[in-house]
Amino acid sequence: MTAGERYPVVVTVGTDHHPFPRLVGWVHRWAAAHPDVRVLLQLGTTEAPEPLASVHAVDLLPHQDLVAAMAEADVVIAQGGPGGIMDARSVGRQPIAVPRRGDLGEHVDDHQVRFTAWMAQRGLVHLATDEAALLLELDAGLADPARLRIPPDGGAIDDTITAFRAVVEPLLAARRRNR
């Protein structure tokens, strides 16, 4: 990825060692039918599909590069783990989440199926459990990118830092006084 490149669609399969060919295949078929839309596709351990001019496929990206691409994207599609979902939300993008399935060898079990259903019930992700749902969400997101924009969500990080500071700062102040 070159600095300054913008991809309207960013897809991440995460860093799990299991391949995720189902999601990669769905996105690849969509991209082949939409050659005018640039896609950044982070593959992880999934085998790269046939190259398309509109798709920049990479095994892994440095975390800061992936998050920066998410911030510039109209649509972020993430596997159903908390890392990619929270990264997208942290930069103001409500992701389309596609859970990995244990019965397909995409993960050890179906915890992503349960997790993404829980997130979707609370309006925190758009859930796509099959190709038709993914394409519907993807097309709707490109037609109206505002529907996938949210205020940047730092999650509990800010609260955790505040609580940490409340405990540590008095300890440091006491230590300084006792020197």
Give the ranges of each region predicted by the language model:
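Donor-nucleotide binding loops and adjacent catalytic segments primarily
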Residues: 1-72
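Hydrophobic beta-strand scaffold residues
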Residues: 39, 95, 126-127
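A donor-sugar binding/catalytic signature common to diverse glycosyltransferases
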Residues: 66-108
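Short acidic active-site motifs
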Residues: 64-66, 133, 137
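C-terminal amphipathic helix plus adjacent low-complexity
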Residues: 136, 140-179
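Short acidic-hydrophobic, aromatic-tinged amphipathic segments that line or gate anion-handling sites
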Residues: 57-60, 125-134
